[in-house]
């Protein structure tokens, strides 16, 4: 097996992403476990400028919300966009260099954050590279637009609509996020806009782009309704960017934007219902009986649905005062991120024989990997939601009783309630790291020692185009 430094086409470039994906997931697992350990055992483990809970939190945020997200957007664009446009990518050498520039700058941010922790923002970006990231991603979006305008098909397929939306909102979020502001409300407002556009929309659209591809080409099914697909796309496009403001309910944000966020979050039920009906009716027509790929797709969709149900339920006026400014919002972020990562695992399994021409045998190793991933993601999602509910209720009860839970006896009581699920999260991070290690071994085994099979060709016919 050889991977050329300068690939000649999209198919050759995709090999780079397939090989690198398990390594990035492993990096995420290592940093996540280290962060959880330094938080739980802060009084035992040594703390210094390079190993402390605060810096590890920022490193974890950057890997999760920036490095992996940008990597997935580039990965999907390289492979899916030419298939949905019916032609090869225009000016591919420039596209290749721009893609490497995006991933390279996000990786450089990680290194600069470790070397200059004072310039490392909470979500992981640094002030050194922000303007360069905006420029290089602007060039990437421009190249995507040029290719879309040169498409050979009369309309843009649903998976490409979501993919282009993810790229556009990623660029918008880069222009939004800056350092700390003097006015406290400005920090809340900017952080909320960043979380909504970058994490909620970015990861949701990556997931939905992959979902529409995998439920058609991945499991050989026929999309039930393009109309429902369009309803889902435009619904999530207009509603998701507003949904994070509600988690600052009762803070210094204006009431009107909190109320808009509450109403629009409830409205997520419409695109969610359209997408759910489309998914259920589509998968009933599948002809591929690969249980591992199908189970990962179905489970990731279930996580996505639960995450959006959390968004809707938290918008009820008698519930949001309890859940604002708690871990419940982190649970929602986690759901969007790991629904995309889970379906990415199934996508990589699907691509290995297509790109490398190596058959992947779905043995006990792949079954165990799938089980651990699904177990960790589901339990961690519920654990973070539970922490949010318990801490929010305790804060409100303590404030009403005149015994605040941010210090003293009230804080000790709150910590006794949430310490167990927080410790559970640390052990779940250990299992997640183990699952990612198994996934790395699975991919490596298939790429190196898998039986030779027929790889797909770069030519695209009308019959091969996905929905």
Placement of each model-derived feature along the sequence:
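Hydrophobic cores of alpha-helical transmembrane segments in multi-pass integral membrane proteins
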Residues: 14-46, 50, 54-114, 127-147, ...
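Internal maturation/activation junctions in enzymes
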Residues: 284, 317-318, 325
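Non-cytosolic membrane-interface motifs at loop->transmembrane helix junctions
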Residues: 119-129, 155-158, 186-196, 253-264, ...
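Short, Lys/Arg-rich, polar N-terminal cytosolic tail immediately upstream
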Residues: 1-9
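Short, intrinsically disordered terminal tails adjacent to the first/last structured region
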Residues: 1-2, 462-467
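Long amphipathic alpha-helical scaffold segments
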Residues: 285-290
């Amino acid at each position: 097996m050889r991977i050329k430094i300068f690939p000649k086409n999209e198919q050759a470039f995709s090999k780079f992403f397939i090989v690198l994906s398990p390594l990035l997931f492993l990096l995420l697992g290592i940093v996540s476990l280290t962060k959880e350990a330094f938080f739980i055992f802060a009084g035992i483990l040594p703390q210094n400028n390079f190993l402390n809970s605060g810096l590890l939190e920022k490193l974890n945020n950057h890997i999760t919300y920036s490095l992996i997200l940008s990597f997935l957007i580039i990965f999907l664009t390289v492979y899916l966009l030419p298939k949905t446009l019916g032609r090869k990518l225009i000016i591919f050498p420039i596209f290749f260099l721009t893609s490497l520039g995006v991933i390279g700058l996000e990786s450089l941010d990680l290194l600069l954050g470790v070397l200059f922790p004072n310039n490392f923002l909470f979500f992981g970006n640094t002030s050194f590279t922000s303007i360069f990231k905006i420029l290089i991603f602007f060039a990437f979006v421009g190249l995507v637009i040029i290719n879309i305008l040169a498409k050979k098909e009369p309309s843009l397929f649903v998976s490409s609509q979501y993919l282009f939306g993810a790229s556009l909102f990623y660029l918008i979020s880069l222009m939004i996020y800056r350092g700390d502001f003097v006015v406290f409300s400005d920090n809340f407002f900017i952080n909320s806009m960043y979380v909504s556009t970058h994490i909620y929309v970015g990861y949701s659209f990556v997931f939905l782009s992959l979902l529409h591809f995998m439920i058609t080409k991945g499991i050989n099914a026929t999309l039930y309704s393009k109309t429902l697909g369009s309803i889902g796309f435009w619904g999530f496009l207009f509603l998701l960017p507003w949904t994070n403001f509600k988690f600052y309910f009762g803070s210094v944000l204006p009431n009107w934007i909190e109320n808009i966020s509450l109403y629009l979050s409830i409205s997520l039920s419409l695109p969610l219902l359209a997408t759910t009906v489309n998914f259920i009716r589509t998968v009933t027509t599948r002809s591929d009986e690969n249980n591992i790929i199908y189970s990962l797709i179905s489970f990731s969709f279930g996580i996505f649905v639960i995450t959006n149900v959390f968004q809707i339920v938290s918008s009820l006026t008698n519930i949001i005062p309890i859940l604002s400014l708690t871990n419940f919002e982190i649970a929602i972020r986690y759901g969007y991120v790991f629904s995309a990562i889970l379906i990415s695992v199934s996508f990589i399994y699907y691509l290995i024989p297509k790109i490398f021409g190596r058959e992947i045998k779905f043995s006990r190793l792949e079954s165990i990997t799938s089980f651990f991933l699904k177990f960790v993601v589901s339990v961690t999602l519920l654990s973070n939601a539970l922490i949010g509910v318990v801490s929010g209720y305790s804060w409100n009860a303590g404030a009403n009783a005149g015994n605040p839970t941010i210090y003293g006896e009230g804080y000790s009581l709150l910590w006794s309630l949430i310490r167990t699920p927080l410790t559970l999260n640390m052990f779940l991070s250990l299992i997640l790291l183990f699952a990612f290690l198994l996934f790395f071994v699975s991919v490596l085994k298939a790429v190196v020692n898998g039986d030779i099979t027929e790889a797909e060709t770069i030519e695209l016919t009308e019959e091969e185009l996905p929905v």
